[in-house]
Amino acid sequence: PTYPYSPGATGGGLVFTAGQVAWDETGEVTGVGDVAAQTRQTLKNVVSVLAEGGATVNDVLKCTVYLADIRDFQTMNEEFAKVFPTDPPARTTVEARLAEPTMLVEVEAVAYVGS
């Protein structure tokens, strides 16, 4: 889908991702009904946007995770730990209604790459 925003932006040595969701390359939500699958795709998208800004997961300072149902926290957390296995970033996780009813998780990240 096309929305009026940038998937990522850079400034002051920082890389900001917009909220990433479980869209695949065709713009379709993947893993409908499966928070683990959606978390994997969402984080894959985060990593891709970070790379476009010159950052890696090792540069991430902070993530914000939005869950359609906070009861999915543990499942999301298990997938998150696979991407950030050591020295994970600061993180806030909240329950929120997401843009489309099939979306279960959204993640945004801030990374530092220097000036």
Which residues does each predicted region cover?
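Short, polar/acidic, helix-capping and beta-turn segments at strand->helix junctions
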Residues: 1-115
